Amino acid sequence: MAKYNIVEKKQKEAVYRTLVSPKMMDEMKEKILRVIVMEKKYKDKNYSAKKLAEDLGTNTRYISAVVNVCFHMNYTSFVNKFRIEEAMAILVDRRYQGLRMEEVSDMVGFANRQSFYASFYKQMNMTPREYRLQQLAQHPLERVAKPSKKTAKKS
């Protein structure tokens, strides 16, 4: 069965490569990264592949092709990757220690806590809570909120 999946995946990638020229693939990859990462559209719960395609003046089939070939994952996994990365930073930042997981989930763009937990576990092989506890135990004094400029001047 595993052999079948590998062959199927290679065939799918080959079809995508014929759909989009290499030059257009590179250009679209950069545009997708700019919008999703630099403009932080991953934080928008409602920012779909369809909306991204509209913003880039293309269609979802091209978006899907570029994401699959260039990033080796589907659109949802691609967006969730950046959400999880931001969540990881928030979870260990002492300024946000009072936040509930629902609030962290909302801040990074997940529709609900369940999808946040499922995506986090899939990517990190532990729950967000386990990650927070592990990181804080390993680095107890790091990630303390930086003093404000007012406080720093008085010292």
Map each language-model feature to its residues:
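Membrane-proximal linker segments that couple transmembrane helices to downstream signaling/catalytic modules
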Residues: 2-94, 98, 102-103, 119-122, ...
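The short coil/loop that forms the "turn" connecting the two helices of the helix-turn-helix
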Residues: 58, 110-111
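Key DNA-contact positions within bacterial/archaeal DNA-binding proteins
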Residues: 61, 113-114
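Short, polar N-cap/turn motifs at the start of nucleic acid-interacting alpha helices
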Residues: 102, 112-113
